[in-house]
């Protein structure tokens, strides 16, 4: 029984890890899967079957205030959903304990599975939350978009120090995400259940949601300047999370430092891309 339960838990971990890896490789290689597009920088136009493909940076019709309001509200909803996953893991822990499933690293496998889903599959939780809201709410929160440009990211001017594409999934999935898992597990282990733990975890979940929002804004909506605002908020919330984790346990805060380092690179890259392409954003 214990072996079977452990295998089921491992299978769930592997499935979520595979989803996260697929998403990361998909984001990095999004432009590479398409044939080269016309150069829109000099006024060229192209059409799809029904609608024109707009030039770089034009895949979102909302005003800045409208887009940021929608992104912020969606991030808070997603963060609440992530907290719900953690609560479900906590509620499931006594069930596994009653079945004789041993703890792993001092934590119930149910709680560890919840950590894994939250950290590696936050965007999947966000999609689930979106699907569970009413059509009217989705209409209010979804940005107004138009078809974007194929090969958009490839065509952007980038700094000479732009990291190679293969480094991104390695840093996110091999370095950043596992150390985040260790940090959250550490915080969970050294704090009592209640508001003191809860608000720190919520701040961390908001940081994850803002990271997913940046992916949508930059890659999905093809908005460099607006993406810069979102990634700055994402970066700030990450630094805040590391600080409040460290208040409770210094090691928990330090375990978020690899992510802080990598997001520093990502934020600087977004700033550089904006500086090089702002006349066309």
Predicted regions and their residues:
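Membrane-interface helix caps and helix-loop-helix hairpins in membrane proteins
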Residues: 216-225, 246-251
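N-terminal signal-anchor transmembrane alpha helix
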Residues: 74-77, 82, 104-138
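Membrane-interfacial loop-to-transmembrane alpha-helix junctions, especially the N-terminal start
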Residues: 195-203
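Terminal transmembrane helical module of multi-pass membrane proteins
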Residues: 243-281
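N-terminal chloroplast transit peptides
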Residues: 1-40
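Cytosolic, membrane-interface loops and tails of multi-pass inner-membrane proteins
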Residues: 134-162, 280-281
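Hydrophobic alpha-helical membrane segments
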Residues: 206-211, 227-241
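Membrane-interface loop-to-helix entry segments
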Residues: 163-178, 222-234
């Amino acid at each position: 029984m214990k072996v079977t339960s452990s295998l089921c838990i491992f299978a769930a971990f592997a499935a979520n890890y595979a989803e996260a890896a697929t998403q990361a490789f998909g984001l990095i290689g999004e432009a590479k899967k398409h044939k080269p597009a016309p150069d829109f920088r000099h006024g060229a136009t192209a059409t799809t079957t029904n609608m024109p493909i707009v030039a770089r940076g034009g895949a979102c019709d909302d005003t800045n205030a409208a887009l940021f309001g929608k992104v912020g509200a969606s991030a808070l909803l997603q963060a609440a959903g992530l907290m719900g996953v953690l609560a479900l893991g906590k509620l499931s822990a006594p069930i596994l304990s009653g079945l004789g499933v041993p703890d792993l690293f001092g934590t119930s496998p149910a709680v560890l599975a919840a950590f894994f889903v939250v950290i590696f599959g936050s965007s999947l939780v966000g999609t689930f939350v979106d699907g569970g809201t009413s059509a009217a709410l989705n209409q209010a929160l979804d940005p107004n978009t138009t078809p974007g440009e194929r090969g958009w990211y490839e065509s952007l001017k980038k700094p000479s120090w732009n990291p190679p594409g293969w480094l991104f999934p390695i840093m996110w999935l091999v370095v950043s995400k596992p150390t985040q898992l260790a940090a959250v597990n550490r915080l969970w282990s050294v704090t009592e259940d209640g508001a003191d733990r809860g608000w720190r975890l919520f701040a961390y979940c908001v940081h994850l949601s803002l990271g997913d929002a940046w992916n949508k804004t930059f890659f999905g909506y093809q908005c460099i300047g607006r993406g810069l605002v979102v990634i700055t908020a994402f970066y700030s919330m990450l630094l805040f999370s590391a600080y409040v984790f460290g208040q409770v346990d210094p090691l928990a805060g330090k375990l978020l430092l690899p992510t802080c380092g990598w997001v520093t690179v990502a934020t600087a890259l977004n700033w550089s891309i904006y500086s090089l392409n702002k006349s066309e954003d």
